[in-house]
Amino acid sequence: MVVGEVVVSLRGRDQNRLGVVVGTDDKYVYVCDGKHHRLGSPKRKNPRHVASLSVTLAEDERAGDAGLRRALARLRDLRKGGTIRVEAR
């Protein structure tokens, strides 16, 4: 797993929730979703308990909790068969 990779939780209280890998060490990956687990307190997960979606977020999309929430909401919509919302900046 690499930093910025989008994963889905397979086990635990956060099962089926999307998150972004914000760090790794020898035994664990650290996952944030911007709401339940913010950048300041990431969720420590066993790598066997998450599955990669083969999507990596750009650094500006994962710069803050609000950016994480927006990016994950777009991906959640795509997984449900929706379309990507385009936001004006």
What are these model-derived regions, one by one?
Residues 12-15:
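Short, charged beta-turn/beta-strand-edge "cap" motif at the junction between a beta-strand
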Residues 1-3, 10, 20-89:
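Ferredoxin-like alpha/beta domains used as RNA- or RNAP-binding modules
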